[in-house]
Every structure is written in structure tokens, then in C-alpha cells.
């Protein structure tokens, strides 16, 4: 049984309730939360769950065991969605879901996604990939750190943070999340250190995006998804920061103008107050939905 509900789960179910028989691709299956609810609601659907995280796939397999024969799990990046569809020979694809957030259980694993605990600086979603957060913070030049933190984190104190990271690592390597979070914390002016959002949030986001090449993968995957989904099929995206949301918005707009898509969400859907109370991490989520013409 699902131990917690995935972000915007009610809204996902609303948009998927009328899907016809076929395959639904959960391109970021995580622990299988959305997939579980979709399979339960839609007895004629089969799900292909994709994730690059081995542990996520283990959790999803256990969670979806009641639906044996109606789901397949694939270890892959969602940017390879076209190859997955071809290899598994799935047709028609009536829906595709992208949830770009970090799974709650990934935050619990000691992989450096969270600055709430002392953990090694890793941040890889695919633990077999080479680039780690440790390498980024200890070996990237100051100018590159500034660019990443400024662009991917939209952090106004990026220059100061990059400078302080480089100063600190001259004395010793930055090995843990706590060390990095403390450097960022001290880079903020004292009067801004105690706001609702921790000063390290944007920097951690930026480094995670760099390590996992997230934005380029989102762009590539969306382009492919639009050509994979069948006519009348839907694409649902859940973004957690403005850079992701902007990519989705611009891609949907481009394909609407090309008469490929009908955008079903004129403005992004955000979580209701009760969901935010239950799951504060959902606060920044934005959902956009489009239908293939």
C-alpha cells in the first residue's frame, strides 16, 4: 500500500481518469506513488515505469506488486524515452507523466541531496554515473561555480558563495553536505540567514541540476514525448522550480503553434492548502498538461 501520496496526485488522477486502453509511461516512476494510483483507477492501462535510480526501482517494484502483469520497470534516463518505447514495442502510448522532483526516499538516502543531515557530497540519481557534487564543489573553477549557482539556482548571492567555496577548499576539501550548507549560510547577509527557505536550498538545487544534467534531459525528453504519445493522449509535467517550468511552458507553446498540442492548463496547477500542510515539499510544484492533436 502507498505509504504517502505523490505530489498533486488528485490532479494527476483527474487528468488520467478518461484515458483509453493502452500504455502509460511514468517517466520518473520514483517509488511508484503516481503509478500505483493510476493502475488502481484505470484497469485497462499498463504502465512503463522509468527511473535511473536502482533503489527507486526496487521500491516501485514492491509497491506495484499487486498489479503483476500490468507494469514494467526500466532503468534508464527519461531522455531515452524513444528508445524505451521502441525496445519494448509499446503501442499506443496514451499518456506520459514527468515528475521532476527529487523523491522523498532519495532525500532520506545518504546521497547528499539534503542539507538537513551530515552526508557525503554525492547527489547522483544514477549512482553509476561519474560526476558527483564532491567533484563540482572541490574542482570546478570559481567562474564555473558562479555560473551554475547563478543560472541553475537563480541565487542572487552566487558570486559570494562561489568565492567562499573556493576559499574554504584551499584549506581542506569540502566533503559533506553540512560543510557546504554552512559555507552558503555564512555567505548570506546576517539579516537574511533565518528566512523560511534555508539559504543553502538554491545552491544545492543548482549543484544537483549540474550533477544530473537535468535541464537538458528535460528538454530532450519533452520533445520526444510529444512525438511518442498517440492522438488524444496526454502529457503531464510536474516542475519544482522556474527553470523546469519555463522549459515545459515554452515547449508546449511551440508545439501548440505547430498544431501538435492543445494545452489543457492555461495556467499551471499548484497544490491546494491541505496538500501543502500534509507535504510541505509540494509547495513549489507546478503542473502543466497538454493533449496531442
Swiss-Prot record:
InterPro entries assigned: RsmH (IPR002903), SAM-dep_MeTrfase_MraW_recog (IPR023397), SAM-dependent_MTases_sf (IPR029063)
Domain of life from the UniProt record: Bacteria
GO cellular component, one term: cytoplasm
Catalytic activity field: cytidine(1402) in 16S rRNA + S-adenosyl-L-methionine = N(4)-methylcytidine(1402) in 16S rRNA + S-adenosyl-L-homocysteine + H(+)
EC number(s) per entry: 2.1.1.199
Major site of localization recorded for this protein: cytoplasm
Molecular-function GO terms, alphabetical: rRNA (cytosine-N4-)-methyltransferase activity
GO annotation (BP), single: rRNA base methylation
Disulphides: none
UniProt-annotated binding residues for S-adenosyl-L-methionine: 32-34, 51, 78, 99, 106
Pfam families: Methyltransf_5
Positions of region (Disordered): 274-293
Keyword S-adenosyl-L-methionine carried by entry: yes
Keywords: Cytoplasm, Methyltransferase, rRNA processing, S-adenosyl-L-methionine, Transferase
Subcellular location: Cytoplasm
Family, per entry: Belongs to the methyltransferase superfamily. RsmH family.
Physiological role: Specifically methylates the N4 position of cytidine in position 1402 (C1402) of 16S rRNA.
Name of protein: Ribosomal RNA small subunit methyltransferase H
Taxonomic source organism: Sulfurihydrogenibium azorense (strain DSM 15241 / OCM 825 / Az-Fu1)
Higher taxonomy: Bacteria, Pseudomonadati, Aquificota, Aquificia, Aquificales
Gene for this chain: rsmH
Amino acid at each position: 500500500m502507498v505509504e504517502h501520496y505523490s505530489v498533486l496526485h488528485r490532479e494527476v488522477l483527474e487528468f488520467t481518469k478518461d484515458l483509453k486502453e493502452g500504455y502509460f509511461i511514468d517517466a520518473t516512476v520514483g517509488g511508484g506513488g503516481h503509478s500505483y494510483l493510476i493502475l488502481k483507477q484505470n484497469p485497462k492501462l499498463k504502465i512503463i515505469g522509468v527511473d535511473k535510480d536502482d533503489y527507486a526501482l526496487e521500491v516501485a517494484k514492491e509497491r506495484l506488486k499487486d498489479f503483476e502483469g500490468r507494469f514494467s520497470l526500466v532503468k534508464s534516463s527519461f531522455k531515452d524515452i524513444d528508445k524505451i518505447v521502441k525496445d519494448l514495442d509499446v503501442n499506443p502510448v496514451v499518456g506520459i507523466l514527468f515528475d521532476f522532483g527529487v523523491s522523498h526516499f532519495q532525500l532520506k538516502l545518504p546521497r547528499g541531496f539534503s542539507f538537513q543531515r551530515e552526508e557525503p557530497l554525492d547527489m547522483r540519481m544514477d549512482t553509476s554515473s561519474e560526476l558527483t557534487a564532491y567533484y563540482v564543489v572541490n574542482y570546478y573553477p570559481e567562474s564555473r561555480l558562479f555560473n551554475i549557482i547563478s543560472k541553475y539556482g537563480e541565487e542572487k548571492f552566487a558570486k559570494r558563495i562561489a568565492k567562499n567555496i573556493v576559499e574554504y577548499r584551499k584549506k581542506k576539501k569540502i566533503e559533506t553536505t553540512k560543510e557546504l550548507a554552512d559555507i552558503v549560510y555564512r555567505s548570506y547577509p546576517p539579516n537574511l540567514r533565518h528566512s523560511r527557505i534555508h539559504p543553502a536550498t538554491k545552491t544545492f538545487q543548482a549543484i544537483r541540476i549540474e550533477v544530473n544534467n537535468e535541464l537538458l534531459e528535460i528538454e530532450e525528453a519533452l520533445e520526444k514525448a510529444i512525438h511518442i504519445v498517440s492522438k488524444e493522449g496526454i502529457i503531464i509535467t510536474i516542475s519544482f522550480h522556474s527553470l523546469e517550468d519555463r522549459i515545459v511552458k515554452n515547449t508546449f507553446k511551440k508545439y501548440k503553434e505547430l498544431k501538435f498540442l492543445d494545452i489543457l492548463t492555461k495556467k499551471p496547477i499548484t497544490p491546494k492548502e491541505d496538500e501543502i500542510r500534509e507535504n510541505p515539499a509540494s509547495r513549489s510544484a507546478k503542473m502543466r498538461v497538454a493533449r496531442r492533436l
